[in-house]
């Protein structure tokens, strides 16, 4: 967050006497180069100029500017009028016009220091930093003890990342004026930029000893306290600044940022709404408001606020980077990456942008690049807690679980862990088989942030994986607050059914909420709900509709997106286990709760009659966009040992990836059969599955279809498998005819492939 404005305000600031005004008002200092005017007009010009400068000092800028223009109408080359009219243009946001006017004044009197300092301020406003620095240098060459120029140059150097040089300027100011509260607080800002927080705080405290009611120093002290993690003290400092100056927008902005850090986003938003109302051109407030709106899980509004900030500061790297974060929240990682790359083009060494780029790359399933982005950030700042946590996330994506845990632990040593960091560390522990430690970590995250949905949800998944269904299904309900899942939440006017009241004679909507495999697994509960005497509406994804029409005697089917009639209750499919208090022994686990269409089965039987037995259906990869696809899918080439066997292998893939195309074409020449062009929906696939002798599949919707049909199925699982497959078991209570074969080494499928070959008599 920015501290308060630090550049010396030109000439008319109410906080100090203006060197410009004091050196240009007297008649004895009248511009010797000005065109002579008639004697009777001289007094009129002088009076007009004096009145204009008085109005300027009072802040009545429009009237002052009118006065300066009148003077220039009489005397076009009046140095003072040109200079101060330029200053007034700067103060009214017209920096380009200010530059032109002040440069005209300098041509008339090139040895005056004040115009160069004010010219530098106008260049700063246009982000023409090198020209601004040159102007401040010129002012100080003319007057090495010019405090305003030292102040302005110091602040510019600090903004340019040259904090050590800035500190030297503020020390020079203090040598000239030891009791300058402004120099002391600006010195504190330079020290803060150098990472010397304790010294910075001391400098701000000294400023407040000199001037206890100095809002700027209170605001700057608050920024240091916030950086030190002393949030309550920081908030008190900002509040004190605002008591003294209620319209202090920088303090309002920093107060909001601190409230955001304190997990009080609603209060933060109140401060920010006041800030943007007071200063609609203050980009930092719109940026902070975006941060708070993200915390309030309002990503669309956050993105709009960031874009308002960008309209005001189009070359601000941090705002571009924050736009990227909001776009990631909105599941638009491609656009996010474009915004973040724009930030890095402006500021290549932005730690925030490098971290956000890593997040976008992870969302794009490009974890290797994400890891490299984190490493770049850590080269620039080895103690960046955010970069270490993000590196752990990328390592977790890559299956480098122990390395991820090491990254999280190092981050914990360097700074207090956030709820997100504790949650990610717990995921690593879970993947390492340290489930009780993982649950303790999730609990810590919840203690830190009570409503942190991800921690609750992941804890639920961990408990489900352990077979603790009672607690697991309860916490699984937190999914509706998790970004990426909550967007699928349905808002109905009717009540969510959670097991009570009785359903006899009532109408309930059961609806698909996640993937196709989830719908296939949990549609079994239709019969359980029907047994309660309910009238059922069942809403499913379009590819499943023909297959699930077999429920039409118990439920009226709808495709997602169709208009729905009135109903009394609703329940998403994956909330039904909680509603029915499902535990391991009570899972509805009929051997085959789905059947294929008999007419389609007859056709497939005829088509397969001429193929060598056994006929084995295989699925080696799932949806490439699935979050765990890297770990659950197998490169087809690795299955080569199977294709030397005396058997027919039938591809059950919806599509073949380009990375598998070469192996696929080669295996087709050695007997792999592909019927993809004849499989239009799941009813077609179900009929084909019914006719094969066995299915061998990775964890995808095809596995659930085979299990639901009661086919002998071998499921190939990564070491860190999905919660529904529990731990270590070779069977599953969900599908009695399914056998599970698990990796023993993360990412290594060789042993699994060998075990399958042996179990099928293929070696």
What are the residue ranges of the model-derived segments?
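Alpha-helical solenoid repeat scaffolds of the TPR/TPR-like class and their adjacent stem/linker regions
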Residues: 1-694, 699-763
């Amino acid at each position: 967050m920015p501290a308060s404005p630090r550049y010396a305000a030109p000439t008319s600031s109410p906080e100090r006497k203006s060197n410009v005004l004091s050196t240009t008002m007297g008649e004895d200092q009248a511009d010797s180069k000005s065109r002579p005017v008639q004697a009777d007009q001289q007094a009129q010009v002088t009076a007009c100029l004096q009145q204009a400068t008085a109005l300027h000092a009072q802040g009545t800028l429009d009237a002052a500017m009118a006065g300066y223009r009148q003077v220039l109408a009489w005397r076009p080359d009046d140095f003072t009028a040109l200079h101060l009219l330029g200053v007034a243009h700067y103060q009214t946001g017209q920096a380009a016009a200010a530059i032109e006017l002040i440069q005209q004044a300098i041509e008339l009197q090139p040895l005056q220091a004040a115009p160069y300092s004010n010219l530098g301020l106008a260049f700063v406003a246009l982000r023409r930093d090198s020209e601004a620095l040159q102007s401040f240098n010129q002012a100080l060459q003319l007057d090495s003890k010019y405090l305003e120029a030292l102040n302005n140059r110091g602040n510019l150097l600090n903004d340019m990342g040259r904090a050590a040089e800035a500190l030297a300027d503020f020390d020079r100011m203090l040598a000239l004026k030891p009791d300058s509260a402004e120099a002391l607080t600006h010195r504190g800002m330079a020290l803060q930029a150098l990472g010397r927080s304790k010294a910075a705080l001391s400098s701000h405290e000294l400023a407040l000893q000199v001037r206890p009611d100095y809002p700027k120093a209170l605001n700057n002290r608050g920024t240091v306290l916030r950086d030190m993690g002393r949030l309550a003290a920081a908030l008190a400092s900002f509040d004190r600044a605002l008591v003294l100056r209620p319209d202090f927008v920088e303090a309002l902005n920093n107060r909001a940022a601190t409230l955001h850090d304190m997990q009080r986003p609603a209060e933060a938003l109140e401060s920010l709404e006041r800030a943007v109302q007071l200063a609609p051109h203050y980009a930092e407030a719109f940026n902070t408001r975006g941060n708070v709106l993200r915390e309030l899980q309002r990503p669309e509004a956050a993105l709009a606020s960031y874009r308002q900030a960008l309209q005001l500061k189009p070359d601000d790297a941090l705002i571009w980077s924050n736009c990227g974060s909001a776009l990631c929240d909105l599941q638009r990682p491609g656009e996010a990456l474009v915004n973040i790359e724009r930030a890095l083009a402006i500021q290549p060494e932005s730690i925030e942008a490098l971290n956000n780029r890593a997040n976008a790359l992870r969302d794009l399933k490009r974890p290797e690049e994400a890891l490299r982005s984190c490493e770049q950030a850590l080269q620039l700042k080895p103690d960046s807690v955010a970069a270490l946590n993000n590196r752990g996330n990328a390592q977790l994506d890559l299956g480098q679980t122990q390395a991820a845990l090491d990254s999280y632990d190092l981050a914990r040593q360097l700074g207090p862990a956030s709820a997100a960091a504790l949650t990610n560390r717990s995921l690593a522990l879970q993947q390492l088989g340290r489930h009780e430690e993982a649950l303790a970590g999730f609990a810590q995250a919840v203690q830190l942030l009570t409503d942190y949905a991800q921690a609750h949800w992941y804890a639920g998944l961990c408990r489900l994986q352990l077979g603790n269904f009672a607690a697991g299904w309860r916490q699984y309900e937190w999914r509706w607050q998790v970004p990426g899942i909550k967007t699928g939440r349905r808002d109905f006017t009717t009540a969510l059914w959670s097991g009570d009241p009785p359903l006899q004679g009532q109408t309930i909507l059961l609806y698909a909420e996640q993937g196709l495999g989830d719908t296939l697994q949990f549609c079994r509960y239709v019969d359980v709900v029907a047994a309660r005497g309910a009238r059922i509406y069942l809403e499913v994804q379009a590819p499943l509709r023909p297959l699930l029409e077999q429920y039409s005697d118990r439920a009226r089917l709808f495709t997602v997106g169709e208009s729905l009639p009135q109903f009394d209750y609703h329940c998403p499919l994956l909330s039904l286990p909680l509603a029915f208090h499902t535990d391991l022994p009570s899972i509805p686990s009929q051997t085959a709760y789905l059947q294929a269409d008999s007419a389609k089965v007859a056709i497939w039987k005829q088509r397969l009659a001429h193929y060598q037995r056994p006929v084995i259906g295989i699925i080696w990869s799932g949806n490439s966009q699935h979050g765990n696809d890297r770990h659950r899918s197998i490169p087809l080439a690795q299955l080569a040992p199977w294709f030397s066997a005396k058997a027919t292998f039938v591809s059950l893939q919806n599509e073949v990836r380009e990375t598998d195309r070469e192996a696929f074409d080669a295996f087709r020449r050695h007997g792999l059969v592909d019927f993809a062009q004849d499989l239009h929906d799941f009813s077609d696939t179900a009929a084909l599955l019914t006719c094969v002798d066995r299915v061998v599949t990775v964890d995808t919707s095809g596995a659930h279809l085979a299990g639901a049909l009661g086919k002998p199925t071998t499921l190939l699982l990564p070491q860190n498998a999905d919660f529904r497959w529990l731990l270590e078991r070779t069977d599953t209570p969900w599908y009695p005819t399914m056998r599970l074969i698990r990796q023993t080494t993360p990412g290594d499928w060789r042993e699994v492939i060998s075990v399958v070959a042996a179990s099928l008599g293929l070696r």
